[in-house]
Amino acid sequence: YLETGEEWPAAAWESCKTADAILLGAVGHPDARLPNGDLAGAGVIFGLRFGLDLYANVRPVKLYPGVAHKIHDEFKQVWKPNLVDFVVVRENTEGLYTPARGTLSRGGSDELAVDSRIITRKGAERVIRFAFELAVHRGGAPRDRKHRVTCVDKSNVLAGDRLWRAIYDEIAPKYANVERDYAYIDAFTQWIVRSPEAYDVAVAPNEFGDIATDLAAVLQGGMGIAAGGNIGDEHAMFEPIHGSAPKHAGQDKVDPIAMILAVQMMFDWLGTRKGDAALTAAAKGVEAAVAGVLKEGKTLTYDLGGSAKCSEVGTAIAEKLAPVRGRRAAAKKRAR
């Protein structure tokens, strides 16, 4: 944007509409602002979410063995790997992030700002149903292995959330093998820290899910290894959930694992959508390679307590994948 005055090339939107899947890198720079004061780059993210109707923001929260947590500027294991494995499904096209907002100015001074929060039946139904379908295919909560969907809202205060919870209660009985669970967003933020093992899938309105997933990233080791998917009925986009970290640009020091796990999520989604076993196997291979490097603990970037470069972590993960690729190539050759 600083060079061209455009957030992205005009042809990029058309390419995204026809792509099998979209992989998005982190965007944004504090010096790159639109004439209205908004950060340049947000139009790319929201343009794709709204334009392609990517209504389900899927955020896996999984702690891999070997990952230490940075608490009080010290690295130590606080949560246990076998007890942190849940997914937050965040509604992605409504809530406070819809462009229904404005300001009132008097005498050159902004006196009033309004952000309208939109919750519709259609929007709530489809993302809540998505969460239940996801729970059906998962292994359940670590504590008891029960399939469970937690409805996260603030229905004791907000009218939109009363509609949200009512729709959840309409959908839940259709999934007899999935347990119902409820949490107000303020309580949920402490419960996932205290007892993450109780959760399997949680579903939340847009802004609540946004806040909760950033907090949940701490449980898995931080934003540097947190990936997410933006999924609709016809399209999907995958991304690391962290920002662009311009202060680290060009230093080869940031953690590449969030982006690599975004690729893993993309392979998994494509494999399921297309019925392609090779893509599904690729997703499993990438995750296993990441898990192997994390468990060894020898090649980690600064955010995980190590001193390795970004490129060194990428190389270590690629080396873990090499034997897998070799075995599959040999098997394919024998099959011929």
Positions of PLM-derived features:
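Glycine-rich phosphate/nucleotide-binding loop
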Residues: 1, 191-296
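N-terminal glycine-rich phosphate/adenylate-binding segment common to multiple enzyme folds
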Residues: 3-117, 207-209
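Solvent-exposed alpha-helices and their adjacent loops that cap or buttress functional pockets
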Residues: 14-17, 51, 76-82, 141-143, ...
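A short glycine/serine-rich beta->alpha loop
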Residues: 30-34, 245-253, 304
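Glycine-rich phosphate/diphosphate-binding loop of Rossmann-like nucleotide-binding domains
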Residues: 108-186
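Accessory "access/gating" subregions that flank catalytic or transport cores
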Residues: 156-227, 321, 325
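Internal helix-turn-beta structural module
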Residues: 272-328, 336
